[in-house]
């Protein structure tokens, strides 16, 4: 039982002890990888840098990443966060970019057919402490 758990949407801006955290699944990375030479599924933090530069979580979309037309674009990054966390690629990375820690969470899931098709090997069960 998790009495203190709060469920949020995707993306989410949450404040933890005064620290502004941007949490995003990372689906937008799928459209960035084929279009940017330095961005790979093994180095998703490069996509995160582009997202921060462009101030949008899906600066390229339409090929693999469909976006719902809404009155307000929920993918816009109005202000840079103190911490930016994403996943989706099942990679693992921690890197600082312009004073912002970029955290790519690992996975507990095994290799999927999609990953096999891409020739990508996930980095499983990596925890930071």
Residue ranges and their predicted role:
Residues 1-129:
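Extended recognition/assembly regions associated with phosphoester-bond processing machinery
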């Amino acid at each position: 039982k998790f009495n203190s758990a709060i469920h949020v949407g995707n993306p989410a801006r949450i404040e933890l002890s005064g620290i502004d955290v941007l949490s995003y699944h990372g689906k937008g990375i799928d459209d960035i990888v084929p279009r940017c030479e330095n961005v790979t599924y093994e180095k998703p933090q490069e996509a995160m840098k582009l997202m921060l530069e462009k101030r949008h979580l899906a600066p390229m979309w339409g090929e693999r990443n469909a976006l719902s037309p809404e009155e307000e674009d929920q993918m816009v990054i109005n202000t840079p966060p103190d911490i930016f966390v994403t996943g989706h690629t099942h990679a693992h990375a921690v890197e600082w970019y312009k004073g912002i820690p970029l955290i790519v969470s690992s996975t507990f899931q095994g290799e999927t057919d999609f990953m096999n098709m891409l020739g990508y090997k996930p980095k499983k069960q990596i925890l930071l402490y």
